[in-house]
């Protein structure tokens, strides 16, 4: 009888472990259509450098942005969808600005203010901040709950800023993320 209880306990433990592993696999890989965006670190003087990809996937909760990036500065970085499908530099006030051809934060609903990704009266292109670890990698996915379909973001670009994002226009405009650091065109 003791052997039977032990076998039963082991069987239940195995089933539970398999269920947890299966749930983890589903959490780690959102189901649904996806596109992969090539991302480059912006350097107008010496040429852009590949730093990895961001995979955008449809989920029941919104679009999931899963970075697979390396070679970036550690810390939190502003992460946005920009208006134009370009990462080219453009001149402003006599200076060549990295990624300026991408335009501004994507704002198709005319909110005209920076905010949180779930905030209805903010730019649609406002995403959660991107976390870069001490080794220069970024792999933690972020969710954009107001964006539902890949077709919404095609024909725009992804922008990563040198600084963090306070999801407000105060004290600095557009979250205070500073210079455009890396970019990828969403095709």
Curated annotation (Swiss-Prot):
Keywords from the UniProt entry: Copper, Disulfide bond, Metal-binding, Periplasm, Signal, Zinc
Q: Where is this site: Ancestral copper-binding site?
A: 82
Keyword Glycoprotein (UniProt): no
The signal peptide here is 1-23
Chain residues that bind Cu cation: 80, 105, 161
Q: Which cofactor does it need?
A: Cu cation; Zn(2+)
Any one Gene Ontology cellular component term annotated for this protein: periplasmic space
> What does this protein do, in the record's words?
This protein lacks enzymatic activity (probably because of the presence of a tyrosine instead of a histidine at residue 82).
Quaternary structure and partners: Homodimer.
Protein name as catalogued:
Superoxide dismutase [Cu-Zn]-like
UniProt source species: Haemophilus influenzae
């Amino acid at each position: 009888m003791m052997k039977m209880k032990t076998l039963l306990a082991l069987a239940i433990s195995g089933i539970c472990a398999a269920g947890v592993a299966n749930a983890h696999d589903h959490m780690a890989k959102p189901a649904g259509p996806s596109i992969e965006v090539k991302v480059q670190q912006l350097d107008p003087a010496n040429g852009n450098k590949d730093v990895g990809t961001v995979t955008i996937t449809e989920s029941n909760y919104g679009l999931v942005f899963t970075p697979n990036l390396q070679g970036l500065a550690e810390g939190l970085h502003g992460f946005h969808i920009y208006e134009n499908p370009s990462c080219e530099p453009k001149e402003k006030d006599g200076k060549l600005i990295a990624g300026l051809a991408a335009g501004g934060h994507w704002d198709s609903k005319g909110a005209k203010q920076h905010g949180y990704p779930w905030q209805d009266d903010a730019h649609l292109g406002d995403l959660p901040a991107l976390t870069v670890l001490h080794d220069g990698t970024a792999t933690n996915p972020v969710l954009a709950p107001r964006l539902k379909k890949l077709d919404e973001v095609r024909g725009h670009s992804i922008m990563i800023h040198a600084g963090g994002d306070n999801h407000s226009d105060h004290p600095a405009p557009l979250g205070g993320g500073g210079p455009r650091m890396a970019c990828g065109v969403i095709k």
